[in-house]
Design a protein with these regions (language model features):
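Short N-terminal binding/cap micro-motifs at the start of the first secondary-structure element
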Residues: 14, 32-35
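N-terminal accessory regions of nucleic-acid-interacting proteins
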Residues: 1-23, 27
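Short, glycine/acidic-enriched loop or turn micro-motifs at the edges of active sites
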Residues: 29-31, 105
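Non-catalytic, usually N-terminal nucleic-acid engagement modules in DNA/RNA processing proteins
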Residues: 24, 33, 41-47
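Flexible glycine-rich surface loops and low-complexity tracts that mediate binding to linear polymers
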Residues: 25-29, 80-81
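Active-site-proximal helix-loop-helix substrate-binding element of RNase H-like nuclease domains
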Residues: 3, 43-115
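Short, glycine/acidic-enriched capping/hinge loops at junctions between secondary-structure elements
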Residues: 34-38, 53-55
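A generic structural signal for short beta-strands and their flanking turns/coil linkers
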Residues: 21, 38-40, 50
């Protein structure tokens, strides 16, 4: 496996990052209820061995760099069970995430149910 570089930041992605094509996105929360539970971390992977962990302190949801990436129509955001991640990102950051690709839905569509 190739080396992975993990970058950690508070409340937003660093300014000046550029991505092309697609990024993988995942969130970590304090629970599974969108209206009740807080977004703690948003993870972004570029598929080239870099991962950014954005840790939210619960007081600053402005995240202009992360919002710009999540709303960028030229970059596909890849999720697994995106329904929850997209909802929690919209609830806390107020961003409409698009375009998206959900690997959970794709796996159900591609399933052949054969031996």
């Amino acid at each position: 496996m190739a080396d992975v570089t993990i970058h950690v930041s508070r409340n937003d992605l660093p300014a000046g990052l550029t991505f092309d094509g697609a990024v993988a996105v995942d969130t970590e929360t304090l629970g599974l209820k969108v209206g009740r539970d807080r977004l703690c971390v948003c993870q972004v992977g570029d598929g080239k061995g870099n991962a950014w962990l954005v840790q939210f302190d619960g007081t600053d949801w402005s995240a202009p760099n992360l919002k710009k990436l999540l709303a960028d129509p030229g970059i596909t955001k890849i999720f697994h069970f995106g329904r929850f991640d997209i909802a929690i990102l919209h609830h806390h950051l107020g961003v409409d995430v698009a375009p998206v690709f959900c690997t959970k839905i794709a796996s159900k569509l591609a399933r052949t149910y054969t031996d």
